[in-house]
Each structure stands twice: as structure tokens, then as C-alpha cells.
Amino acid sequence: MAPLVGLFLIWAGASVFQQLHPVNGGDIPDPGSKPTPPGMADELPTETYDLPPEIYTTTFLPRTIYPQEEMPYDDKPFPSLLSKANDLNAVFEGPACAFPFTYKGKKYYMCTRKNSVLLWCSLDTEYQGNWKFCTERDEPECVFPFIYRKKSYESCTRVHSFFWRRWCSLTSNYDRDKAWKYC
């Protein structure tokens, strides 16, 4: 047992020493000179930056809607962090998500993070540039009855569920669409 403890201490000590970085003091200042804190320059930078005249606002507000003509990227539903303020993206409540919707050839049955940091959904069944950030109210509804492995279910089920959590299908036929959510 003692040899194992010794090997462990050697391994742990070596790991600690490998993580240490050498400290280089640099040039030694002349005796009697005033010390300068690291990173301090004698002069401040003189660069200036021209900002655009428009008023900008961040878009991290939930429930934000953007029409296609305001889209900052080609067919990407995520606005830039600085988007022009307008009447549409200041709206807090908007139309409902169109579930299921198709975006770039893939069908979505719930909000997605595709090309985005935040959850969003399309307002059209075929994505045409009209979209919004999702809220708690934008969750898709369970569809009852639904078919799972050729059996009909009238309510949420725990069959084949991870940790026995109840789930439901988002379409009438799970076997065909594979769309589901936890209840």
C-alpha cells in the first residue's frame, strides 16, 4: 500500500509542477526610478471610431419578430447582435409558430436553434423569412391519439422512456414522423 501512496504523491506532485509557468521579471529598473505597473503605457491611444448615425438596439429580447427584408443574413433566421430598431422587432407578442415548419428542407416540429443561439420558429409552414424567438407559450401541443409501434395511445406514456419520464407524440403517427416531447 505504501508504494502505491508514494507513486500517487509523485504523480500528483509532477502534475502540479507541470502546471507552473516560469516568471520572467524582465528588465531590472534603475535604482531610484519610479516603478511602472505592468501594461501601463506612457500615452493613451489616439484612435477614434466612427459610429453609424442610426440608432441600434440589441436583439436579445424574447418574442422578437423580423420580416424577411430586415434579415441581416441570407436565409439565416438569427439577427446580428446590433439590429436596426423598427416597429416589428419591438413587438412583445406576435403570431403563433407554424408547427410543423420546413427550413432548408428539414421539417421541425418544435422550436430550433439551427443557425441561432436562441430558440426560434417560423411563422410560415414553409420558411419564407418570417420568424420569431420562442417563448414558453410556443411549445408544440401533444397530439392524441397517436400511434407508437403500431399501438394507439390516448395520453402521455412512459413506454420505452428514459428514466420513465412521460412523453407524447407531436403528430398522429410517431412511427412515421419521430416527433415527440416530454409531457
Curated annotation (Swiss-Prot):
Gene3D superfamilies in UniProt: Fibronectin, type II, collagen-binding (2.10.10.10)
Cited InterPro entries: FN_type2_dom (IPR000562), FN_type2_sf (IPR036943), Kringle-like (IPR013806), SP_Capacitation_Regulator (IPR051666)
Domain of life: Eukaryota
GO CC terms of this entry: cell surface; extracellular space
Annotated keywords: Disulfide bond, Fertilization, Glycoprotein, Heparin-binding, Repeat, Secreted, Signal
Entry-linked SMART domains: FN2 (SM00059)
GO MF annotation list: heparin binding
Example GO BP: phospholipid efflux
Glycosylation sites: T36, T46, T57, T58, T59, T64
Main localization, broad class: secreted
Signal peptide: 1-25
Residue ranges constituting the Fibronectin type-II domain according to the UniProt record: 92-136, 137-183
A Pfam family that the UniProt record links to this protein: fn2
Subcellular location(s) of the protein: Secreted
The family this protein is said to belong to: Belongs to the seminal plasma protein family.
PANTHER family per the UniProt record, alphabetical: SEMINAL PLASMA PROTEIN, SEMINAL PLASMA PROTEIN HSP-1
Protein's UniProt name: Seminal plasma protein BSP-30 kDa
Originating organism: Bos taurus
